[in-house]
């Protein structure tokens, strides 16, 4: 039996297969560039692990207080080496990316301080953390003020607006690297470095924190290599390599990470406590696999862009642009298009492939959200998934794929569902 015959049994028509094959021929150069990036980052991870003498003992579980957990502590040294920082906090007790960001903000902002976003509104789930939407326990409730500077019409930074917004109260600047549920560009490490340098010129002691979610290992450098004081992310995204069952990380300056550790546990305890509960093998091996897993996800994003831009849909970024994160936005023009696309992604999943995704009122979001994810780890967006809020311009956000071939199947299935619904013609 041929591969195409297997695909046919899974519901992918020859028309879709032929279309996909034709599209693939045009993106070979992008795939070569992605492979080169993966090779660089793989070498970086191996070097950090070798320098820190990873051994089988580092995979041992710890319980209770977690005192003297060398596996946990060594992993944090490895993260610090990869990110070029003084320290890192890498813990299963950090439950998600939003939690990691909330932790970093709450640890380093005090009453009377001001938080500034120079890239417009933050990701939806941070609205409650900051207090944009009144929420118990928010930064606003603790007397931390917030302001944001909108991007210019072309998606670039409004430097004059940023200069005007920075004042004596501005303590921390939060920069979201990835587009989130928006159709603005995601930013390169070089662009982030330019923005951080400008902010430091405006106020030398301001803390610059980058929300690094979805961007790790997509480029050769990380934001902390170009001046960021902290980089924050989730282990069920890129750096967990699809194996980490939970967790988050914060890498940065020692004093800032120490404050994060005290906020995560308790003042006086900090990083000395926090049992690993047996997740170290997954954390280490997931990090080891992450460069190639991220490369697979980026290839899937490029293939998605190439297919849908050929059909006349607006895609951000285009198939020819150099990638800055693993997310691919496709504006599908209608609620029906979003639903059909997500049904295709779900149908390609190894887990819950029989489930039909539908829009629902998801906590933390103002609009209904549709999510397709047949994942081994719940909510792991490094695994093949697609989601988006049901609102204009009806953009769906495709990400993940632990292997390129799974990402490819997901795209083909999305095309098939769109074709079956009469929403595209091939």
Question: How should these model regions be labeled?
Answer:
Residues 73-78, 83-94:
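Short N-terminal amphipathic alpha-helices
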Residues 2-28, 35, 45-51, 55-58, ...:
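Conserved PLP-enzyme active-site core in the AAT-like
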Residues 54-64, 86-87, 326:
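Glycine-/proline-rich flexible loop or hinge segments
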Residues 309-426:
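Conserved C-terminal alpha-helix-loop-beta "cap" of PLP-dependent enzymes
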Residues 86-90, 113-116, 171-172, 205-208, ...:
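Structural motif
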Residues 38-42:
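Acidic, PIN/NYN-like endoribonuclease modules and their adjacent C-terminal/linker elements
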Residues 63-71, 75:
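N-terminal small-domain helix-loop-helix segment of the aminotransferase-like
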């Amino acid at each position: 039996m041929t591969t195409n015959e297997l695909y046919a049994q899974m519901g992918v028509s020859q028309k879709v297969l032929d279309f996909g094959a034709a599209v693939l021929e045009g993106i070979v150069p992008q795939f070569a560039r992605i492979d080169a990036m993966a090779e660089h980052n793989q070498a970086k991870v191996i070097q950090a692990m070798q320098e820190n003498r990873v051994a089988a003992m580092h995979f041992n579980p710890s319980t209770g207080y977690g005192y003297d957990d060398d596996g946990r502590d060594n992993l944090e040294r490895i993260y610090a080496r990869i990110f070029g920082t003084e320290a890192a906090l890498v813990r299963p007790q950090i439950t998600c990316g939003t939690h990691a960001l909330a932790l970093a903000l709450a640890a380093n902002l005090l009453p009377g301080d001001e938080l500034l976003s120079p890239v417009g509104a933050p990701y939806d789930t941070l609205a409650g953390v900051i207090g944009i939407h009144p929420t118990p326990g928010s930064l606003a409730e603790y007397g931390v003020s917030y302001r944001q500077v909108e991007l210019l019409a072309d998606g670039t930074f409004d430097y004059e607006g940023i200069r005007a917004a920075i004042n004596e109260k501005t303590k921390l600047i939060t920069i979201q690297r990835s587009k989130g549920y928006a159709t603005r560009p995601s930013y390169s490490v070089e662009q982030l470095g330019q923005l951080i340098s400008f902010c430091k010129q405006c106020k030398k002691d301001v803390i610059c924190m980058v929300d690094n979610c979805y961007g790790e290992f997509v480029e050769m450098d990380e934001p902390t290599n170009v001046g960021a004081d902290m980089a924050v992310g989730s282990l069920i995204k890129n750096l967990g390599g699809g194996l980490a069952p939970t967790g988050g990380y914060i890498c940065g300056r020692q004093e800032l990470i120490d404050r994060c550790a005290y906020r995560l546990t308790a003042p006086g305890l900090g990083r000395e406590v926090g049992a690993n509960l047996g997740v170290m093998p997954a954390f280490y091996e997931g990090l080891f696999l992450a460069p190639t897993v991220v490369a697979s996800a980026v290839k899937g994003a490029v293939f998605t862009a190439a297919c849908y831009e050929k059909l006349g849909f607006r895609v951000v970024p285009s198939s020819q642009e150099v990638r800055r994160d693993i997310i691919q936005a496709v504006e599908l023009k209608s609620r029906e298009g979003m639903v059909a696309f997500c049904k295709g992604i779900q149908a390609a999943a190894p887990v819950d492939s029989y489930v039909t995704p539908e829009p629902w009122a998801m906590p933390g979001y103002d609009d209904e959200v549709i999510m397709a994810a047949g994942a081994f780890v719940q909510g792991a967006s490094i695994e093949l998934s697609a989601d988006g809020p049901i609102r204009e311009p009806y953009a769906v956000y495709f990400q993940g794929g632990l292997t390129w071939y799974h990402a490819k199947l997901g795209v083909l299935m999305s095309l098939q569902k769109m074709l079956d619904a009469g929403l595209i013609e091939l």
